[in-house]
Regions:
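C-terminal lobe and adjacent flexible extensions of AdoMet/dcAdoMet transferase-like proteins
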Residues: 188-237
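Class I SAM-dependent methyltransferase "Motif I" SAM/SAH-binding loop
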Residues: 19-21
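SAM-dependent methyltransferase
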Residues: 116-198
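A short SAM/SAH-binding and catalytic strip from SAM-dependent methyltransferases
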Residues: 76-96
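A short glycine-rich, Lys/Arg-flanked "PGG" loop and its adjoining helix->strand segment in the class I
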Residues: 95-111
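Conserved alpha-helix/loop element of class I SAM-dependent methyltransferases that forms part
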Residues: 1-11
Length: 237
C-alpha cells in the first residue's frame, strides 16, 4: 500500500492481483478505494477471500490457473506479491512458468500501466537452501478450531539447475483433539537470479522505474550479494 500510494499519489487504480489467496492484500487495497480483481488456483484460499470481500462492492475474485489463464486487459496496476515467483505450481518448466507470469502481467496492463512485484532475491542461495535442520515456518488455528503447522526437515540446492528441493510434513489437530500427519513432499522451487528476473521484465516490455530494498526507500543493489527482500515498480512500455 505504501509503494502504491507513493507512486500513484493516492489516485484510485484498477488493480489485478495474481495469486490473491485469501485476500490478505486485495481486501485492504479495495478498502483504500481501489477497484480490485484477484484470482487464485486454490479454491480453499478463495473461500476465505469470498468471505472477506462480502459487502465490499469494489472487489471481486475468481478461480484460475495463472500459467494457462488469460489475465484480462487494461489494468492500471498488476500486483504479484507474497513471493509468487517461487511458489508456482505447474507442470511447465519452472523458469518458463516464472517468465510466463511476468509476460501475462505485462499483457494485462494498459499502456503505461505498472507491475508491482514483491519477492525474495538470493545472491547466494547455497547459503540459504542447503540445510538439514528441522523447522516450522507456519502455525495457526482456523475458525473451526483446527490447528495446523508445518514441519520441515531441510532442503538442498542444485547450483546448476537452481532448483531447491525440500521435504517435511503437515500436522493437523482437530477441535476434538484428533491429530493427523500428512507428508508434504517438500518444495520444488526454481530460485531465479537477479539477471533472470530483470531480463524477463525487459523481454515482457517492462521498464524498472524504482526498486525498494527490504520495504525501505533504499534501492536494491545490483548485484545482490546475499538475501534481499525486493519490491519492483516497473512500467509497461
Amino acid at each position: 500500500l505504501k509503494v502504491l500510494k507513493e507512486q500513484t499519489g493516492g489516485t484510485p487504480q484498477r488493480i489485478l492481483e495474481a495469486a490473491c489467496g485469501g485476500g490478505r492484500i486485495s481486501v485492504p487495497l479495495a478498502q483504500a478505494g481501489h477497484d480490485v480483481t484477484g484470482f487464485d488456483v486454490d479454491e480453499y484460499m478463495l473461500m476465505r477471500c469470498y468471505a472477506r470481500i462480502s459487502g465490499i462492492p469494489n472487489i471481486r475474485c475468481y478461480c484460475a490457473d495463472a500459467v494457462t489463464a488469460d489475465w484480462g486487459r487494461d489494468y492500471d496496476v498488476v500486483l504479484m506479491a507474497g513471493n509468487v515467483l517461487i511458489n508456482i505450481e505447474s507442470e511447465t518448466d519452472y523458469a518458463e512458468a516464472q517468465a510466463t507470469f511476468i509476460k501475462k502481467a505485462a499483457c494485462a496492463l494498459r499502456p503505461g500501466g505498472h507491475l508491482l512485484m514483491d519477492f525474495d532475491l538470493h545472491g547466494n542461495p547455497e547459503a540459504v537452501f542447503n540445510r538439514l535442520k528441522q523447522s516450522s515456518y507456519f502455525q495457526g488455528t482456523d475458525e473451526f478450531g483446527t490447528t495446523g503447522k508445518t514441519i520441515g526437515y531441510g532442503s538442498v540446492f542444485d547450483p546448476v539447475t537452481r532448483i531447491c528441493e525440500a521435504t517435511g510434513h503437515w500436522e493437523l489437530t482437530t477441535n476434538n483433539g484428533e491429530t493427523f500427519i500428512y507428508p508434504s513432499g517438500g518444495g520444488h522451487k526454481h530460485i531465479p537470479t537477479q539477471r533472470q528476473i530483470w531480463g524477463w521484465l525487459e523481454d515482457a516490455g517492462l521498464s524498472i522505474e524504482r526498486t525498494y530494498k527490504g520495504y525501505t526507500d533504499e534501492p536494491v543493489p545490483d548485484p545482490v550479494e546475499g538475501y534481499c527482500k525486493t519490491t519492483v515498480w516497473a512500467q509497461k512500455n
